[in-house]
Amino acid sequence: MEELKKAIIKQVGEKPYLNEEYPKLIAKRAYQNIANEAEEYRDRIVFGGEGSEETLKYSPTIIYPVGINEPIVQHEIFGPLLPIVKYKDDEVDALLNVISEREHGLAFYIFTKNKRWAKKVMQSQQYGGGCINEVCLHLMVKGVPFNGVGHSGMGAYHGIWGFREFTHPSTVLFGKTKMNLSLREHPYNKKKKNLLSKFLK
């Protein structure tokens, strides 16, 4: 926990909401949602928990400890709140089962030195995209899609995937006005049937 605090301070200072380079939330309503949710866990905030509604900046906020069934870990936060769930090694499988039964997230990140376990975990969950021992970098990889799944959004974007997702192909045929395809018209004699059977092969 202390290392996490140090990392935040190193990046954006002890009062990040006063840092000019620190980004703001998209709108006043978004700021209020984050501030209100943080306030519900005021007694468990171990870092942050402050901001400026005027600038719409809210500091990265660590909330600990949080239970896996508490409201804050059952929805996408879309803000700088980090709830931390404590668990024991022998509780990991049960925890993953709980996660897999919920709405699928846009991203899924795990940190481990065990490659075999990492592969097993990544294959056991559904998510838009993910990383092992990293965050967000999968969004920057050229030539692969960025996508959601279920509640986090359907479809894939970036490159050719984005083009296909946001376009709708329509087939249009220009017919000749000077000739008529009599083959398709009644009566269907033997000659027409033979020709049609060749077209259909």
Identify the function of each model-found stretch:
Residues 9, 58-201:
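Conserved C-terminal structural/oligomerization subdomain of aldehyde/semialdehyde dehydrogenase
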Residues 4, 22, 195-199:
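Generic structural signal of hydrophobic/aromatic residues within well-ordered alpha-helices
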